[in-house]
């Protein structure tokens, strides 16, 4: 029986699995509570290698800057805010987080440029949930080669990992990959 559990321990990191699935995917859809640029950085090379891939990210919480570190917050004002206000606050908090000095490197600027190009080309969409949401779900719609390898139109991973460096490889997590359910 195949081991579908991904724990970030002993050569079973979510980063490695997502990178492999990106190689065989035509579209990615991620629902995450936290979206740090540290997670984007971990997937950058894999995404850059696919000039045709589309990515949709739905973020359930905001980002903010605290003591020189990026972290996410559950905004209590969200209950009384319009979708436009939520999106505005999310991108404002992202701008603050991106001004952190630890991100002031040439590599980071190249990654941001790639990120912005994906947005401009319509290959990347980032949206904010109306209500706070801490769920984690990674959907992979496979290309024809990927479908023939796993005999399924897609795969999904759900569990505890956010789209952060820690969630992708830095700390113990528990995720499960499923491919035989929910694709019809």
Segments from the language model and where they lie:
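PLD/PLD-like phosphodiesterase catalytic module centered on the HKD motif
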Residues: 1-184
């Amino acid at each position: 029986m195949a081991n579908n559990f991904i724990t970030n321990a002993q050569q079973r990191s979510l980063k490695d699995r997502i990178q492999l699935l990106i190689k065989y995917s035509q579209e990615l859809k991620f629902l995450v509570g936290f979206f740090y640029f540290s997670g984007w950085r971990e997937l950058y090379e894999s995404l850059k290698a696919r000039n045709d891939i589309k990515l949709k990210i739905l973020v359930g919480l905001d980002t903010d800057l605290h003591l020189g570190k990026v972290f996410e917050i559950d905004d209590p004002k969200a209950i009384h805010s319009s979708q436009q206000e939520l999106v505005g606050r999310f991108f404002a908090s992202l701008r603050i987080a991106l001004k952190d000095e630890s991100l002031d490197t040439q590599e980071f600027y190249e990654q941001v440029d790639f990120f912005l190009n994906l947005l401009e080309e319509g290959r990347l969409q980032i949206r904010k949930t109306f209500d706070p949401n801490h769920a984690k779900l990674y959907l992979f719609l496979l290309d024809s080669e990927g479908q023939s390898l796993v005999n399924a139109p897609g795969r999904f991973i759900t569990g505890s990992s956010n789209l952060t460096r820690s969630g992708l490889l830095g700390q113990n997590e528990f995720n499960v990959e499923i491919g035989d359910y929910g694709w019809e």
